[in-house]
Amino acid sequence: MSYDWEKMRKEEWPVLETMTFLDAACVSFAPQRAVRAVKEFADMTARQDEANSSAHHIALDDMRHKAYAEAQKLLNADPEEIALIESTSHGLNIAAQGIQLEDGDNIITTNLEFIQVALPWCVMRKEKNIDIRVCKPEDERFTVESFAALADERTKIIVMSTIEWCNGWQTDLKALGNFCKEKGIMLVVDAVQQLGVTKIDTKECHIDLLAAGGHKWLNSPYGTGVLYVNKESLSKIKQSYAGYLNTTVPEGGWGAYWENPAAPSVNNWTFPETARKYEIGGTSNYAGAVALGESLGLVNEIGIENIEARVRQLATYCMDRIEEIGGTVITHRDPGHFGGIVIARLYDDLDVDRMILKKLHARKIFIAQRFTDYVGGFRISCQYFNNEKDIDTMIEGMKDLIQEIGREPD
């Protein structure tokens, strides 16, 4: 299916006419449809069209519902498997607090993670004698065998990023999920660098819990993200929060309940056995959820298969162009194992590359520089709203600076 990428870019991201933006792996821009939805929500908060304040609150809450439906569609999940969260950090903490570990248990993560991935379990080590085992890649590639080599009968969780932020490697989730299911290990994933980029089918991949903030590749404003919890895992992950809005709604609704003179302040509340029980259950970030619903809707409207093909085409073009000017590409081109992140270097001297980065920014060419455990370099994000011209502009800027430095890349 062909798609008019340039038309979409002009209609949804007019800001891209003012700069060369290749940094969606850090933060991205909201499309105009999300901006309009937030403005509509803000207008609703300035008036009341409903019969009373309780009905008004419910109407505002209902505006979040599109985000659930669109996330469910994108992940090929069931309705009871989707919740909305504040961020990836929020979702990972739900996993850490909810999956019970005992002294002597271990979890496995990798050496290339963003610090938040293992952080909740690092804190847990202060109270429990748990072991955090760190998987290191072979030639910067993580495989099932990489994780299996560290696993034993006390391994309870594998927690990792589906696409690594500092080398762009996309792990085979289906294979890793099958391994975890066979061994009785919980698979917890940070999908913030993959969701909205390449396909994640939760019916094919045995993932227990997935968390992804919306402000990167989903192009949503800050403060809202997606939580997926496999329905087979709902009983295995303890509920962290108890808010009245994630209890079972009383007969007649909350408005009728509050008007009941006999309503008790203490009750034996029940919670639906769905992923929404992990939400905080209070007044939430409605505006963020409204925007997230629109941004997810755009991804589904285009089609994740189309986006995946587009992003990988741009990433491949980017890698080719960097190599043309003598740069070194760190990201592997293995089919199915890269998304929109391209990691590259021009010089072995990091100070020189930092200077290049600063001068590119001065030209309004926005990329990043990221490292973990000595792996990394320039991080160039090829989002579906980008085009070859963006990459060419970056390359021309790099060529000018190489000439200014006076020596070829290392």
What is each of the regions a protein language model found here?
Residues 1-410:
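Pyridoxal 5′-phosphate
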